[in-house]
């Protein structure tokens, strides 16, 4: 899934 505040990274 995609997570992070301003950037999307794999969790």
From Swiss-Prot:
Give a brief account of the tissues where this protein occurs: Expressed by the venom duct.
Where located? Secreted
Q: Which GO terms describe its molecular function?
A: toxin activity
Key words, A-Z: Disulfide bond, Secreted, Toxin
| Disulfide bond annotation, renumbered to this chain | 2-11, 3-8
Gene Ontology cellular-component terms for this entry are: extracellular region
Q: Which family does it belong to?
A: Belongs to the conotoxin T superfamily.
Q: What free text does the record give on domains?
A: The cysteine framework is X (CC-C-C).
Q: What is this protein called?
A: Conotoxin ar5a
- What species is this protein from? Conus araneosus
């Amino acid at each position: 899934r995609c997570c992070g505040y301003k950037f999307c990274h794999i969790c």
